[in-house]
Amino acid sequence: KGTGIEKLYQTVDTLREFDPKYINITTHRSEYVYKDLGNGLFQRNRLRRRPGTVAVAAAIQNKYNITVVPHILCSGFTREETEYVLLDLQFLNITDLLVLRGDKAKHESVFTPEGDGYHHAIELQEQINNFNKGIFVDGSEMKVTASPFSYGVACYPEKHEEAPNIESDLYWLKKKVEAGAEYAVTQLFYDNKKYFEFVEQAKAAGINIPIIPGIKPFKKLSQLSMIPKTFKVDLPEDLVKEALKCKNDAEAERVGIEWCVTQCKELMSHGVPSLSLIHISEPTRPLYIS
């Protein structure tokens, strides 16, 4: 969040102790606010009020020489705005991306693209593929870069909330792989069995790219209801029972870290490609998890 570059550096300085192989940089979609003009009239204003993903990625890469993976979204971006982001990243020699549809706007009940933007990540992949070939969104051509973008995509061990079934989810994941995705990062989960089952289902469907588990430590009692509602995932009964014994958030955080450590150890013992720790902007939490 927009707390200044020194706060960013403090966070990364803490993370460097663990020799991270890469750092993902999230992107926040633009949002709309409505200004009351009186007489029943409202003016809709589109706002971006956080430092740009490109700026954060460049700051980390240039200071620390750590691979950064900026997230590229359909959500809240037109095709031209996406092209501007790709041009800036290309100039900075930042070539690793995570390509996502992104979330609905806060006021939306269904996902709506921004202007001529995309409904699905696979459409965004096509724009990136064309960019790698030297083709702009308007069809004009540019010099092909010597360092093309490579990218991963998202996947959902407990099914995307909008997918009718897991088979449909796997069908579209395979399409994204065929379109050029080199790996996938999962939605967060708290039950490793669901990850292992999903990986086996993916293999059976002919999906053979690395599937990186996304892990988010549980840390507050309020997350007992917030996590299932926000991320559309289940919390295992054993985790819920332990959390309900907690008298405050400090105790809940300890339970969450212990659960996370157990998860990570089991995943690593099964030879996962890597671990993606989600929401680790609080630099002390990785210290506990380590």
Q: Would you name each region that the model predicts?
A:
Residues 102, 115-148, 153-163, 169, ...:
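Active-site pocket-lining/capping segments in soluble small-molecule metabolic enzymes
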Residues 49-55, 79-81, 105-124, 139-140, ...:
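Active-site-adjacent beta->alpha loops and helix N-cap segments on the catalytic face
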Residues 10-26, 178:
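Catalytic domains of carbohydrate-active enzymes, especially glycoside hydrolases
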Residues 21-51, 105-113, 182-195:
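Glycine-rich, proline-tolerant flexible connector loops at the mouths of alpha/beta enzymes
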Residues 3-15, 80-86, 164-175, 257-264:
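Short, acidic/polar
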Residues 279-290:
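Single conserved hydrophobic/aromatic residue that forms the stacking wall/gate
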Residues 1, 26-30, 73-75, 102-104, ...:
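Active-site beta-loop-alpha junctions enriched in small/polar residues
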Residues 23, 89, 176, 180, ...:
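Conserved, mostly hydrophobic/aromatic
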